[in-house]
Amino acid sequence: MVSSEKGLPESFVPGKRQSDGTSDLSTAVNVKWGVKIGTAFFSTPSVAGGKVFVGGLDRDEGIFVCFDAATGKRLWQWQAPPREVPGTIDGFSIGLATIPHQIGVCSSAAVDGDRVYFVSNRCDLMCLDVAGQSAEPDAGQARVVWTYDMLEQLGVFPCDASNGSPLIVGDLLYVATCNGVDRNTFGAPAKEKERKIPAPHAPNLIVVDKRDGRLVATDEAPIMQGLLHGQWSSPSLGRVGDRTLVFYGGGDGVCYAFEALASVPEQPVRLKTVWSYDCIPPEYKAPGDGDWITHYCLGDRRVKGTLNKHDGTFVGRCEIIATPVFVNNRVYVAIGRDPAHGRGRGALHCIDARGQGDITAGGKIWTYQGLDRTLSTVSVADGLVYVSDVGGRLHCLDDATGQCYWIHDTDCETWGSTLVADGKVYMPTTKGLWVLATGKELKVLGRITLGGKVYASPVVANGTLYVATTQGWLWAAGQQ
């Protein structure tokens, strides 16, 4: 992510955490407020209209909370238990009978006027009123405008989490369904014939009318044919020539470009696939006549007989978890896997977005293979690309050539994405937030310890940096 905000802190001290779930500001430095709500925050905060929206977990229930951006006061909260799903589908025993897997709401919110949209821990696309409920006895609770149940309406079955973040384009919402495989596939080196996809015909990306939640379009990408695990990427948007395209990173390791709808159709239609680009380098695929599903499973360091030494050297297939980034007719996107599978070789691609059809060969501008698997969305600013990997390294590359200028090793895992703003690169890790200077020379400005892991990405608005931790704390930092 990139922001034009200025005057941001290069360091802050959270201060003493108090028993009432707030920060003692007399012991803090460059902190406007800090609050603890629930057990953990996994989603990246969204800031709009003087409010902060963030999803998380409270014990075993998903939560979505709205705060006052200036004071940290909780204005309202939505909360729901995990969803029980059928234990068998089409005669198959399904390993995950609860959605999601103890991680709550992971989707980041999209805000448009007086409405806020997100995907819940129950695989529902939610539309809430940003004002919440004001009248007793419901004051402090969310006001639901509409709900679209993707599991019930589409038959999708998320693997681990339903965490896609909505994309607003006019009156339309583009949302990933998070359809995936049965988690039992990864209990042992499964053969291809043993792989279970509970919903093999469900869509991967849908479009709904943001005003009433009506389904208006679905994709027809052949992702299920090569689905590896789950689908945790989110769609993005770009204008290419006279076309508006929606980009999506598939669970098969392929980046897709769909033509955006020009208007809201009266009846559901199919999205037109403009191009596809296979982000899995040929040498990463199963060697010889090897079963590619078995090879993928053996890349999970927890599996018996694993080939993964957790040192970043394992080479194998990966899905796309990061969100594709569009800049100047180019798409930047990297491949990765669930961090629990361990480290392994990744790949970052720069793709010419002006193509048509299968552009794997002709659309390649450059590929960088010097990074580990990654979940992180890249930041592109001032001719440079910043991307972190699961191994905890931050890479700075030339955006036109892919030349690597420097690598900073934090010696800890990274799940979130970088934020570039005010001449700084903010990098979330499992041991806090690193701050580095932008540019072709490596310069570390500091590390901020927050008392918990930072899986979400930091965001900035109105001179304030917002950072959420897995301990359920949300911090608002600014120059003082």
Name every feature range the model reports, one short phrase each.
Residues 1-480:
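Noncatalytic, solvent-exposed loop/strand surfaces
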